């Protein structure tokens, strides 16, 4: 039986962090919908404070629409768009930014309160401070991403989209891990088995797969090669190579989709092998075994959902579900990696 120090855990702090994690999850999902509806460039200004309010009059709506008309996306893709149609894409981007602001408020105010009341375990204070800083950085990265589509491109740069999503998911993982530590406390000893390394490696692989998925989304690569398991009848797409090494890795539709597929196959095999190993293991605690089985199930569901999404050319509902599934898989992998460290 693990012994915990009472001063080393705080259930109120844990619950607060779990709420933050749910809000980050919602922001990731709405961000996916924003990308799929091509709404991310609808707000062409960055106003962290005043931008929290949407246009409140017809004149304000027209002013925002006129700003949108100045960017390449309107001229080359949405020329002739009506004000009502513009409002449709505006609300997605506004909701995404509003959730970002809400995450900041829900994190910062309780953090100060718990800090003053000395309710945060000492070893977690620095983590919470880092999370607060990363949250602020995420807002800057978000605008950096949007700005890439305001002058020459008709969409945001895929590598900047990958950076924005990657930081959001890193925050998601960090918040969940910290919440679990706040809930359970720190064990006097940590379990040292081969499972620790494997679980962290699997978590890293899931995170990397999410970054590959961002490149697929940023290049609209889910709209091509919509057969499976082949790609237009071939194992390797004919249009694999891009303009140079980075062009292939980050901008070739064929390459980014193939890489995303291959990583999915690797994760699927690794999850099945881990599930069998967990079932046979005598050293793995029962709670960790259960988490491993859930992890296998989530991997299988996400793989099936990914194939379905691809073969139907990424309809909005399935695309959003696939992004939500990626976040759920990451949360499950995080929980498993955290759990196997504890005896």
UniProtKB/Swiss-Prot annotation:
GO CC annotations on file: plasma membrane
Entry's transmembrane regions: 13-33, 96-116, 130-150, 165-185, 197-217, 258-278, 290-310, 311-331
Gene Ontology molecular function, alphabetical: metal ion binding; oxidoreductase activity, acting on NAD(P)H, heme protein as acceptor
Pathway: Porphyrin-containing compound metabolism; heme A biosynthesis; heme A from heme O: step 1/1
Enzyme Commission numbers on file: 1.17.99.9
Necessary cofactors: heme b
Catalytic activity: Fe(II)-heme o + 2 A + H2O = Fe(II)-heme a + 2 AH2
Residues binding heme: 260, 322
GO biological process: heme A biosynthetic process
Localization of this protein: Cell membrane
Keyword Repeat: no
Family, similarity comment: Belongs to the COX15/CtaA family. Type 2 subfamily.
Role of this protein: Catalyzes the conversion of heme O to heme A by two successive hydroxylations of the methyl group at C8. The first hydroxylation forms heme I, the second hydroxylation results in an unstable dihydroxymethyl group, which spontaneously dehydrates, resulting in the formyl group of heme A.
Protein name: Heme A synthase
Native organism: Caulobacter sp. (strain K31)
Gene: ctaA
């Amino acid at each position: 039986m693990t012994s915990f120090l009472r001063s080393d855990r705080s259930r109120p702090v844990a619950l607060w962090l779990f709420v933050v994690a749910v809000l980050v999850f919602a922001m990731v999902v709405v961000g996916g919908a924003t990308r799929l509806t091509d709404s991310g460039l609808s707000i062409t200004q960055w106003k962290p404070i005043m931008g929290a309010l949407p246009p409140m009059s017809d004149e304000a709506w027209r002013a925002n629409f006129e700003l949108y008309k100045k960017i390449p996306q309107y001229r080359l893709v949405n020329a002739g768009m009506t004000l009502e149609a513009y409002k449709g894409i505006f609300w997605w981007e506004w909701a995404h930014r509003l959730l970002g602001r809400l995450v900041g408020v829900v994190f910062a105010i309780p953090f100060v309160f718990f800090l003053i009341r000395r309710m945060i375990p000492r070893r977690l204070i620095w983590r919470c401070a880092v999370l607060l800083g990363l949250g602020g950085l995420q807002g800057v990265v978000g605008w950096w991403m949007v700005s890439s589509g305001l002058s020459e491109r008709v969409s945001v740069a895929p590598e900047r989209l990958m950076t924005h999503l990657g930081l959001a998911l890193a925050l998601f993982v960090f918040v969940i891990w910290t919440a679990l530590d706040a809930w359970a406390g720190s064990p006097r000893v940590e379990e040292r088995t081969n499972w620790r390394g494997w679980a962290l490696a699997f978590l890293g692989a899931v995170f990397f797969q999410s970054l590959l998925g961002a490149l697929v989304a940023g290049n609209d690569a889910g709209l091509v090669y919509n057969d499976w398991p082949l790609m237009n009848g071939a194992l390797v797409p004919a249009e694999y190579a891009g303009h140079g090494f980075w062009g292939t890795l980050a901008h070739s539709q064929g390459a980014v989709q193939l890489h995303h597929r291959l990583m999915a196959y690797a994760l699927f095999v690794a999850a099945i092998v881990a599930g069998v190993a967990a079932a046979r293991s005598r050293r793995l605690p029962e709670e960790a075994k259960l988490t491993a089985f859930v992890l296998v199930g989530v991997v299988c569901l996400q793989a099936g959902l990914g194939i379905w999404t691809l073969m139907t050319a990424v309809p909005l509902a399935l695309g959003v579900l696939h992004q939500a599934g990626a976040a759920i898989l990451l949360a499950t992998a995080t929980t498993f990696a955290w759990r196997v460290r504890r005896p």
